[in-house]
Amino acid sequence: MSAIAKPEAVTQLRTVAPAQEAQPVIVRLDQVYKSFGENQVLKGVSFEVARGEMIAIIGASGSGKSTALRCIDRLETIDSGSIEVAGIRVDDPQVDLHRLRREVGIVFQSYNLFPHLNVLENVMLALRHVKQQDRAEARRVALAALAQVGLDEKAGAYPEQLSGGQQQRVAIARSLAMSPKVMLFDEVTSALDPQLTGEVLRVMEDLAAGGMTMLLVTHEMNFAKRVADRIIYMHQGRVWEVGPGDMLDHPHTPELQAFLAADL
């Protein structure tokens, strides 16, 4: 059931889609505010994500989507409010960032692969230095993660030898190898052409089908409608409307109606 999130009534958002009602909440944002200088980017953002849920966050540029995602992984600190992920208080000044980053994987639009390392070495790097795995174990885990995204045969290739879609899939494998409880995707297909976009979206759809908890900032409306358990529409730093995928066919607010019309 769709809900309209007014600034004074953000608690309306604390509704988990029916298929996920039995699952515990793994991500919780409560009245989160964030400013950059005098520019207030997040204005009382509140929502919850159940374990195994796939949430798509949509909205115009500057609506706060990516900032919300970055705050979840403590890449940005919030001004007020609270964020909890997998039992970790992200807003705690003393939060163990190494523990948080083991629980949360994040993939960006830019691939951030090391050009001097081959694909396998890129995926193994965090396993060796963060998880302290020996080389044999890190290799086994990395190859399994690459197989999960369909790139195990490219283990010996270097980033410059891969297409943009393949590089993005390596970036996803690198995060998956750490066995996170939550995966965050920040407009990961926005720099790819339609053909390469499709191969990345298929990997993400497989992850969602496998029960991975995912938050996805995207402009791929058809994908969001088809795959997401719920869609969150953000507008001017607030959660404005939230509901299942078919809410895109029946938007409640004029703001979402205008956003969808502009996206056509």
Feature map (PLM): residue ranges:
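C-terminal boundary and immediately downstream tail of ABC-type ATPase nucleotide-binding domains
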Residues: S2-I4, V10-T11, Y233-Q236, V242-L264
